[in-house]
Amino acid sequence: SLKNPLLAGGEGTNHSPSDSDFDADTFSSSTSASFTSNFAIGSIDTGSDSKSYSGYDYTLALTTSYNGDDSLEVELEAGNTSNLAELDLHQDGDGLRVGSISYTKPLGERLVIFFGDGAAGNKLYSTACVYSGVTNALDDCGNLNAAIDKEFGTAAGLSADLGNGFSAAIGLETQNTGTGIFTNESADAFGAQISYTGDNYGASVTWANIENTGAQAAGVLDTDEGATQSTAFNAYFAPDLNNFPSVSVGFESNHDDSSDLTDANDES
């Protein structure tokens, strides 16, 4: 065959070899792709370094549905913005690599489940935030830790439509290296969220328990045993008025229960 069905963008899966010019058992014709590239230049004043840096990131996101309701998502990414760490951009180098892969599937009319590797544990959350920006804290409307996105490795989650605009979700991440998943040696994170979405406003409460990891090695447990509990409150208002801005607000508090820390280490 001379045709490449990868980005055919058709509806549903291919069930008959006569329907298109590729084998019925090889690939779905419902795969789509999106491409994103960002360029940045700036500086971060750390008190000891305020030099200016530039960088970029690139994302290729592939989405496939096999029955019209499920979704297999693969994200390829590259970026060199490590000197601008406060930006919500890729920082792992110039080589294009698989950043995450996940599969999402509905269970009946009200439940949705997902699992994957490299994906965020908050994938099924409905955080009440309509602001979109480039920095980590502002882009998340202050929900920086409670909405789990630690890149530990294995991730899974479940969401439930409670009706009348209310929804609930749980998410988890766990280290997937030589220590095994959900063991005493692995770094684990789990959390939950309850949210409400109205016609032009919404609110959500998010909570998470994240085991502390070493500053230089994501997913490696800190030598000081403990975990950080985070709670975030978010809300937004998006009036249906021409030229009137939307408003998003958020507040998060964090408590580190490490044995050698005190309440003075609480942050918000």
Regions of interest found by a model, annotated:
Residues V130-T135, A264-D266:
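Flexible, surface-exposed loop regions and adjacent strand-edge segments
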Residues Y125-C129, A217, L261:
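Outer-membrane beta-barrel and related beta-rich outer-membrane complex signature
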Residues S1-G118, D139-T177, S186-F190, S195-D199, ...:
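Beta-barrel outer-membrane channel/assembly domains of diderm bacteria
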Residues S82-L84, G118-G133:
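Surface-exposed extracellular loop regions of Gram-negative outer-membrane beta-barrel proteins
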